[in-house]
UniProtKB/Swiss-Prot annotation:
GO-annotated cellular components: cytosol
Location(s) in or outside the cell: Cytoplasm
Name listed for the protein in its UniProt record: Translational regulator CsrA
Gene3D superfamilies for this protein: Translational regulator CsrA
Species for this entry: Dichelobacter nodosus (strain VCS1703A)
GO MF entry, a single one: mRNA 5'-UTR binding
InterPro entries, alphabetized: CsrA, CsrA_sf
NCBIfam families, A to Z: csrA, PRK01712.1
Keyword match Repressor: yes
Length: 64
C-alpha cells in the first residue's frame, strides 16, 4: 500500500486519468473529490461490497 500525505487542496493523480483531491478535513473525517472518466465506476468500499454480494439496488449505488 502506498501511503501519501496531502493537505486540503492538494491532489494525487492515478494512471493519468483519475484525480483525487482533498477537499476538507474535519475531525476524523476527510472529504475527497474524485474526477474520473464516466466509464470508471466509483463507490465507497461498503457499497462496493454490497454490489458484489448482490445486495441493494441502483438507489444505493454511489457514483461520482
Amino acid at each position: 500500500m502506498l501511503i501519501l500525505t496531502r493537505r486540503v487542496g492538494e491532489t494525487i493523480i492515478i494512471d493519468d486519468q483519475i484525480k483525487v483531491t482533498v477537499l476538507a478535513v474535519k475531525g476524523n473525517q476527510v472529504r475527497l473529490g474524485v474526477q474520473a472518466p464516466d466509464e470508471i465506476a466509483i463507490h465507497r468500499e461498503e457499497i462496493y461490497h454490497r454490489l458484489m454480494n448482490g445486495v441493494g439496488d441502483d438507489a444505493e449505488m454511489e457514483k461520482k
